[in-house]
Amino acid sequence: MTVSTPDSPLDAFTGSITPTRVPLLYQAGLGVVALAMVLLPLVYIALIVAMGWLVWWHLVNDTGIMENVHGRAIVLALLAYIGPAVAGGIFILFLIKPLFSRGLKAAPTFKLSEAEEPLLFDFVKKICGVVGAPVPREIRLDTQVNASAGFRRGWFSFFGNDLVLVIGLPLAAGMSMRQVAGVLAHEFGHFAQGAGMRFSYIIRSVNGWFARVVYERDHWDEKLDGWAQAEHWGIKAIFMLAKGGVWVGRKVLWCLMNAGHAISCFMSRQMEFDADSYEAKLAGSSEFPRTAERLRLLSAAYGAAMQDAYQTYQNRELPDDLPSLVVWREQTLPTAARVSLQNAAHQTKTAWNDTHP
């Protein structure tokens, strides 16, 4: 498959490409990894149940703490009996709340209309047809140096072909049409893998959920910090114990998160490698390294553009055209910065915990 550059981008596609063969062993491996990722949240739930059982056991079996105590010792005995139960209850609460709390809202995107952008929609349909992937129901724009194809309604679209394509405007502004076509072929290459993409969605969802549980903080964390500063030493001790329990619990979850990441990394790299093959087949193997370099440069320029935006925001101003600012920043990158990025790319080797080859 080749992409030339005639008058119409739709005429640029000539020939066809051979679908990348996904070995049966690889698909079976993805299933095993997905099963392991599903088991990790069950370990999380088991931790909640175990902590609940310990609190119940303490309340039922440690009533002797309150027997044969008099005077001021009653206060100490009460704290020794009630304190662990309160601390354990708070610990359980902090483990349960992530099951029901929603994550941070995704950055807003702009939905395109096929009636207003027929050429772009036809361009995407052409790529999907060549790659052998389902056509997305929606195309959206954002300001990232990236493109992504995913389930439009998350889990509700899991068993169908209800997809959404998100194209970053800096990507479109800073790349050639051939390069953009290659990037889109990479994204749709994931969905050409069928079951593999769904296994991957399970894996990434579980990994993302664990990361959110471990690192996100909310107003309950702030309240616990405040309670741990209580003036009464007894109350302070209870909430410090609870705070310590929450810290230990998050460390356990951190271990589960990294276990899931380690389990899934090899399969993730293989999926990305297969998707890369679609990009190389559609845009050309000679264009692939140029696209990768362009992505690195635009990503660095995006960081500089966001710093510019932050500075202007201090004066209650914002850039009029962020994609153009990113492209300008890329064009004016110092030679030393370009060389540094290129050297880093050539010298970096794939590590065991990398998700991309």
Segments the model singles out, each with a brief description of its role:
Residues 125-129, 185, 193, 208-211, ...:
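An active-site-proximal "capping" alpha-helix that borders the catalytic cofactor pocket
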Residues 117-121, 177, 181, 272, ...:
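Amphipathic alpha-helical transducer elements in NTP-driven molecular machines
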Residues 166-182, 263:
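Short pre-active-site segment immediately N-terminal to the catalytic Zn-binding motif
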Residues 2-25, 226-268, 273-277, 281, ...:
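Cytosolic-facing loops and C-terminal tails of multi-pass membrane proteins
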Residues 196, 203-235, 279:
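Post-HExxH zinc-binding segment in Zn-dependent metallohydrolases
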Residues 1-154, 161, 238, 242-253, ...:
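Hydrophobic or amphipathic, alpha-helical segments that drive membrane association/targeting
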Residues 148-149, 211-218, 299-305:
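Secretory-pathway/luminal and periplasmic proteins that interact with or process carbohydrate-rich
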Residues 185-204:
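Catalytic Zn2+-binding segment of zinc metalloproteases
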